[in-house]
Amino acid sequence: MDVNEYQIGGSHYGNGDYQPWDFIIDSDMHYLFGCVFKYAVRWKDKGGLQDLRKAAHYLAKAEDEYVIYGKYDHHVKMLVINPSYYAFYNAIPKPERDIITAILLDDLPTAQRTLSALISENED
């Protein structure tokens, strides 16, 4: 059985044709950005505001490694993997789509601003 045909512990990834882990692998995304991606695309279907905060936390760690320590060398297959393709086939709303695009373009400030705005909009 193909591992994409089943999910353990919920159905929060079963809503689209292109699975988050496939997109992360296909785009050669760094682990920290992959975590930002998965929490940003599933937050409405699984962990809510806590998932958005987790995404922001992983992004802050990535910024530390990338900006402060200069450890992260981010190369993404931009011509092969298009975030619009993933968003279209998985009905990803605009704010989440903007986060994905910003991560893939190494625009960490935009990703952080968009995540912060999304968190603020959804706080009680």
Model segments located where?
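Intrinsically disordered, low-complexity regulatory regions
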Residues: 1-124
